């Protein structure tokens, strides 16, 4: 490859001695000649009596004579018969905003020029050759020129990258390579054989002009988008093309969009798919090293004719509800009935591999609201106890502050557990836990939810302070813990009913008090499960979820509200896990461990999403997500960039809701236990920097060390989801890879691409139970 690049560069130098420059000034044309006003345009070749134009989109401040930027040449679709050079204009503007130089090339078509597909491919190769020949004047890297296109334009691009021949001998710079360095193909008609597209027009030489019949190891990295209901390009054709490329070692990415027809990527057909394909194209080019930094969602939003809708968001998060406590997630080993949660799952999407940011309360809530792991703060283990300054820094954006800035009303009804300070109602002095087991009525809090983006707060700090009811910034009354769950239901319903009286979108975050201790089911729920008080409490929690969903629906919000249901971590040992197991109920389902642990039962959580008429009913996603991803998902939903120095560990799972793959440069997900032990999940593999559970389940770390258990654990979650077989000694290379990635993500201050960030502390210790010898 290096030799090819040198030859290309050498040939370009020669070209400037033998070919006239076309770029001193854009060619002057009449308004009737110009397809895209106010954009530099040149003629890249003359053919059939026509000057074929190429339009150039440059990044702001581009200095062609001193820069070399990645480039792409796009070709419009239209069955080789017609089409508009403007088809990819918005793609060009977006990629130019990301630092690329983009070209939209006209080429000969049957309707206008009376030509055949051969001429289309010839012109495509000529356009790429022209860009490469003039690279130094255009400010283009000659070794980073992509070709892209839709339908027949996708064929032109693919043929330029894959098929030999079809060179125009009249090109003055014929010695310059016309082969692109990457392909960006939107439902391309790239199989032209007897069962493919356009066979009747290329019948005599289809083996030469059909990209699908010419795949070799020299082909460029390829990105393909296709709708599952495309009548011109069967999904099986795209899958075979993808497989054939990968078989010869070519990087290939295929994205199939369920239910979408040919041309679905155009904004006029589907604004959502238009946006998603551009973001996936951004990700693909980033993976090649052509783009840097996160995508520009805000700029992309500005390009849209119709701005994204602003649906309401209702997030219900249970406290200490195990994955196996939801009956539909654990039908064979779950004995607790949860009909309302089950109905929610049936009405939307179930994520089967969702994880809380931590195996315990406070860190998960911090990560959910900030999109950043809590161990990046001073809190390295355990939870906060209240009567102290808020864990969220004053200047740190939260999900609530972001949505509030976008015009949302924001409310938190339930448990905070991120610290706030109580001030004496008479003296204004800060109260402390030692002298006040319960803050008095009238006590003020100035650093609670309202200081971090919420308009309204009704709830409590955590279980020890549950009797102190706070509304907005004051303790308003004392009440028994048994009334808390019904109170939160009533307050949530009241808020939804009030929201129905205006058209302002709202974000309602409902972190419930249950089924965490104190386990206090109301009198009417006692004994209903026939299992235990904990099971009764779970059933009451399910009923509250049903009440909230009913309020959403009866107040007219069913279709424009996203409802998310989850838990902050696994089931607590306070539920009497062994007793439940004896009665046939497994709180973590098939998974090992429970709350506080690094094993799956500590942090694999229920995650259900209902978005009526958008998310498919009874659908599933096995993509791995984390509750820290909530922030980025909302910015993606509104097509906004993540604020600077925010959401450093957050990746949007919005594509998954559309049955698409999540795009991210984040390599894996970081787990942490109550004691601060780390774990790292990357694809099928999970590494634990702990000898035992890292939490409350036996063997705990002390006992595990006495038993001389290995310093780390490695599991293949595909073949061993129950974490029964530690294969760390057999796959030390894989353990080393995950450990290196974990260290990188910790040290970088972020696990995603974006503005350079830093941890709040240097006291992060990776090996809390001692490193292995030799260390990974």
Segment roles from a protein language model:
Residues 67-78, 314:
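Short beta-strand element of the alpha/beta-hydrolase
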Residues 115-136, 277-280, 391-397:
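Alpha/beta-hydrolase active-site loop
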Residues 126-202, 206-207, 211, 438-439:
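Primarily recognizes the serine-hydrolase "nucleophile elbow" in alpha/beta-hydrolase
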Residues 239, 248, 275-276, 286, ...:
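Formylglycine-dependent sulfatase
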Residues 85-104, 336-345:
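Short amphipathic alpha-helix adjacent to the substrate-entry channel of hydrolases
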Residues 55, 235, 239-303:
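C-terminal catalytic histidine-bearing segment of alpha/beta-hydrolase fold enzymes
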Residues 224-226, 230:
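Short beta-strand/loop motif that positions the catalytic acidic residue
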Residues 25-67, 486:
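N-terminal cap/lid segment of alpha/beta-hydrolase-fold proteins
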